């Protein structure tokens, strides 16, 4: 921080002492009715908020930069700073300046960071706001990564154990607002930081916070236990360290009211399907690739939730499909009952819509950030639980019955809030009046004193009017001068001598008298005591609610799940989805399948064309050829989304669906340059393809679109062919392989389980009509020129392209008078006899030991050898 070298003023010394303890935070320093920032902080705040940068006198030293804003508008300004990635420390005056002996005492009263905020101006109620920590531990010769994450506004707290190479994808999947790492691990994480979400703030912490013993002690203290076995996290050392780091960071940032965080769990890969970044992006599960918003995503179609808790959970469900058949069946049965009995579903939906965000309101109550109106709504929401419970206990399916039984009625708490908080309570606590009459005897007495005294003031007003003959005389009040008698200047000659002047105005003067002073003291004293007492009573009520946090959180979790199941059912009924049969076999049958998002975008004049899909022992790898724009990519995405929905527990857009359980969905669809990190389209494509080949199993679903198009025709086709063989021979995964390399159709005759399909078209004399129907057999034409025409390419370009194509089909073409070899002669022939050196090299390959990467390297060597033999 830049600061003048000479003597600072007492207040500035106080500021610098606090700033020294919080160097990484923008320090908001309360001065009167403003929060001020100084020095470099002021420059940052001025720039970030577009407010005036001014200067303040600093004792005998020169003036210092200063920028600030009114304290009553601080929440909005702080929200803007945090959204820009800043961390903010709030330093308040903690004593009355009029009673201060010397400099006013100030303390840090709040710290707000991207990962630690309770403000509605920052949070989206349909999104979680995660704070995540990463820890690395050595276990023998290997390094294990542990992750933990928490949403302080909902008390969701989880840990996970990862391989180091899984860290980047985990962080991108979670997309936390803030990530905590050890300073010593900064360099280790540097290579993958470019893969982290760009809007995520990375906070480096002292290394000592990442000790195992330290973490265990912090966790035991938080959960008031000697062992963490009951939470199922006992053996996850790295994850426990990360969780301990989060709790220490919360304590360090003065989040010392954490008793509402009552549980911690672990993410188990055995229970949930892992979806990597490419799959989430390519399937457009949460956001569309077009603009990154929810518009055009699966979530937009599926989310019919009635409250924020359900909205947050349905996001997690879609991003973490289930892998346990029993869990999937329980959800599907519950959805079926909700779908078949729509009156029940509508009744439940009505109750859900009247329940506010219990999780986030609870966190604000427990941290004393709530307002009276919100607490009243909290009590009203809890009062709906008996009605919801009664409705669910009328159901017949196991899961809905269990959810109904899990709901905990809280009549005592509801009655307490009803008795304590006034129905007309607003957002402000400054002037009191939000604690209900009859709740507390002392408060009622103080209010009676104030009210009686105010009645006496009216009597004084009438008496003084009669005594002075001034009919316009008024007894009034303001916060600066208290109670006073106001008399217009035209009546000043009638003012008695015992009137004591308090203030002179342009058209009037204000006075007081002994009787007015007496009752003013009674009123102000009673009102001041009332406000203090109301604040204490509201604080005590908040503590009582926080003590029942575990029960409230149980109810919140149940309500969120009910909301998601009802949402699935509403969508299934409206859009004609069917109940999928999910089993442990490898068969995958979809009859009349539809893309859930695209079908909603189609007009009634151009309805979505449904397609069938079959994987069984005879069909494991489907090669799909056909023209661009004919629906190949949509067909691939449709298959992935149907499987994802089925294993999330939703009905699916099809006439019939049998889903053999899938452990992971992999996609390689489309391509985009990652130029910021120096990666080309083809390198990105190969990285993604390599990840698929190294991680897929026979239980996986592979959706591959146009593999190899980022390089030359010969290289691309060689890679596509080789990958197909490797998937067939070594993995055995159910695979949809869309390609423009029509030569791959040859694989059907060579490999058992490889079957050709194509996207059909109708050719007329004038144009080509894309039917978007996937049928058996290979295609022999890509119709690229027709696609170019539809895109609006100039007519002369289209005509010339047809001439060139005709020449190619005759095996030679004349371009500017130069004879060109046929297209076949420019592509590598996989069946042509090579010279002796090429033959020898091929014969010496040990195919049983080749990895996918080795195969690509050897292919490159063979290509170089072949080109050298051709004199090129």
From Swiss-Prot:
Q: What InterPro entries does this protein map onto?
A: DNA_mismatch_repair_MutS, DNA_mismatch_repair_MutS-lik_N, DNA_mismatch_repair_MutS/MSH, DNA_mismatch_repair_MutS_C, DNA_mismatch_repair_MutS_clamp, DNA_mismatch_repair_MutS_core, DNA_mismatch_repair_MutS_N, DNA_mismatch_repair_MutS_sf
Q: Where does ATP bind?
A: 626-633
Q: Does the keyword Membrane apply?
A: no
A molecular function annotated in GO for this UniProt entry is:
ATP-dependent DNA damage sensor activity
What is one GO biological process annotated to this record?
mismatch repair
Q: Where is the signal peptide?
A: none
Tell me the domain of life: Bacteria
Keyword set, alphabetical order: ATP-binding, DNA damage, DNA repair, DNA-binding, Nucleotide-binding
Its cellular-component GO annotations read: cytosol
Q: Does the keyword Repeat apply?
A: no
Q: What does this protein do?
A: This protein is involved in the repair of mismatches in DNA. It is possible that it carries out the mismatch recognition step. This protein has a weak ATPase activity.
Which HAMAP family does the entry mention?
Answer: MutS (MF_00096)
Query: In which family does this protein belong, per the annotation?
Result: Belongs to the DNA mismatch repair MutS family.
Write the protein's name. DNA mismatch repair protein MutS
What gene name does this entry carry? mutS
């Amino acid at each position: 921080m830049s600061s003048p070298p000479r003597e600072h003023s007492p207040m500035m010394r106080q500021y610098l002492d606090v700033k020294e303890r919080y160097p990484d935070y923008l320090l908001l320093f309360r001065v009167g009715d403003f929060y001020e920032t100084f020095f470099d902080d002021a420059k940052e705040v001025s720039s970030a908020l577009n407010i005036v940068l001014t200067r303040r006198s600093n004792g005998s030293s020169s003036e210092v930069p200063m920028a600030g804003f009114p304290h009553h508008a601080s929440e909005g300004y702080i929200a803007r700073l945090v959204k820009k990635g800043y961390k903010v420390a709030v330093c308040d005056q903690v004593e009355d300046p009029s009673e201060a002996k010397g400099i006013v005492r100030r303390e840090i009263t709040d710290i707000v960071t991207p990962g630690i905020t309770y403000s509605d101006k920052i949070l989206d109620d349909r999104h979680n706001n995660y704070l995540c920590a990463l820890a690395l531990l050595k276990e023998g010769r290997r390094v294990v990564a542990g992750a933990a994450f928490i949403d302080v506004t909902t008390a969701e707290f989880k840990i996970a154990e990862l391989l180091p190479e899984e860290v980047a994808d985990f962080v991108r999947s979670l997309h936390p607002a803030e990530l905590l790492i050890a300073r010593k691990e900064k360099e280790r994480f540097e290579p993958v930081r470019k893969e982290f979400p760009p809007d995520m703030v990375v906070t480096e912490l002292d290394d000592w916070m990442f000790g195992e013993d330290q973490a265990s002690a912090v966790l035991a203290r938080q959960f008031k236990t000697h062992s963490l076995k009951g939470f199922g996290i006992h053996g996850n050392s790295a994850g426990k360290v990360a969780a301990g780091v989060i709790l220490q960071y919360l304590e360090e940032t003065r989040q010392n009211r954490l008793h509402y965080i009552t549980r911690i769990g672990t993410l188990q890969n055995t229970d949930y399907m892992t979806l990597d970044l490419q799959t989430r992006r390519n399937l457009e599960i949460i956001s569309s690739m077009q603009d990154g918003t929810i518009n055009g995503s699966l979530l937009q179609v599926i989310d019919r939730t009635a409250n924020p808790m359900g909205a947050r959970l349905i996001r997690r469900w879609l991003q973490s499909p289930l892998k346990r058949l029993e869990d999937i069946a329980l959800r599907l049965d519950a959805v079926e009952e909700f779908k078949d009995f729509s009156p029940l579903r509508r009744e439940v939906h009505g109750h859900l819509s009247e329940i506010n965000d219990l999780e986030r309101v609870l966190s604000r109550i427990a941290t004393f950030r709530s307002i009276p109106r919100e607490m009243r709504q909290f009590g009203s929401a809890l009062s709906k639980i008996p009605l919801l419970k009664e409705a669910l206990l009328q159901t017949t399916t196991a899961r809905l019955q269990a959810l109904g039984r899990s709901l905990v009625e809280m009549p005592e708490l509801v009655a307490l809030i009803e008795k304590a908080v006034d129905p007309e309570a607003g957002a402000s606590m400054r002037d009191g009046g939000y604690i209900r009459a009859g709740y507390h005897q002392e408060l009622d007495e103080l209010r009676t004193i104030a009210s009686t005294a105010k009645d006496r003031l009216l009597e004084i007003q009438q008496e003084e009017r009669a005594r002075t003959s001034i009919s316009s005389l008024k007894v009034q009040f303001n916060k600066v001068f208290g109670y006073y008698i106001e008399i217009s200047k035209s009546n000043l000659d009638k003012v008695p001598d015992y009137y004591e002047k308090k203030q002179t105005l342009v058209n009037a003067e204000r006075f007081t008298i002994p009787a007015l002073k007496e009752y003013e003291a009674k009123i102000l004293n009673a009102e001041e005591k009332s406000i203090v007492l109301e604040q204490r009573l509201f604080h005590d009520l908040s503590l009582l609610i926080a003590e029942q946090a575990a029960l409230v959180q149980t109810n919140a979790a149940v309500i969120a799940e009910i909301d998601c199941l009802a949402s699935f059912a509403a969508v299934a009924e409206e859009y004609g989805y069917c109940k999928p049969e999910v089993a442990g076999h490898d068969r995958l049958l979809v009859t009349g399948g539809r893309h859930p998002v695209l079908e909603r975008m189609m007009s009634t004049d151009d309805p979505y064309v449904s397609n069938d899909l079959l994987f069984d022992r005879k069909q494991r790898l489907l090669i799909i050829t056909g023209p661009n724009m004919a629906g190949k990519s949509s067909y691939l995405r449709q298959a992935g989304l149907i499987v994802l929905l089925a294993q999330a527990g939703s009905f699916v857009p099809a006439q019939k669906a049998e889903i053999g359980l899938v452990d992971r969905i992999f996609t390689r669809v489309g391509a985009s340059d990652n130029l910021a990190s120096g990666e080309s389209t083809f390198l990105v494509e190969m990285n993604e393809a390599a990840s698929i080949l190294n991680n897929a199993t026979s239980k996986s679903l592979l959706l591959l679109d146009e593999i190899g198009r980022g390089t030359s025709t010969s290289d691309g086709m060689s890679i596509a062919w080789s990958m197909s063989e490797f998937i067939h021979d070594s993995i055995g995964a159910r695979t949809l392989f869309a390609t423009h390399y029509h030569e791959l159709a040859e694989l059907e005759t060579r490999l058992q389980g490889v079957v050709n399909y194509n996207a059909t078209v109708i050719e007329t004399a004038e144009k080509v009509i894309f039917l978007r129907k996937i049928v058996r057999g290979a295609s022999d034409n890509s119709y690229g020129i027709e696609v170019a025409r539809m895109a609006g390419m100039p007519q002369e370009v289209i005509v010339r392209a047809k001439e060139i194509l005709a020449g190619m089909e005759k095996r030679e073409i004349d371009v500017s008078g130069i004879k060109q070899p046929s297209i076949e002669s420019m592509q590598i022939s996989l069946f042509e006899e090579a010279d002796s050196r090429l033959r020898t090299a091929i014969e010496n390959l040990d195919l049983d030991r080749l990895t996918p990467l080795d195969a690509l390297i050897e292919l490159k060597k063979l290509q170089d050898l072949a080109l050298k033999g051709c004199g090129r």
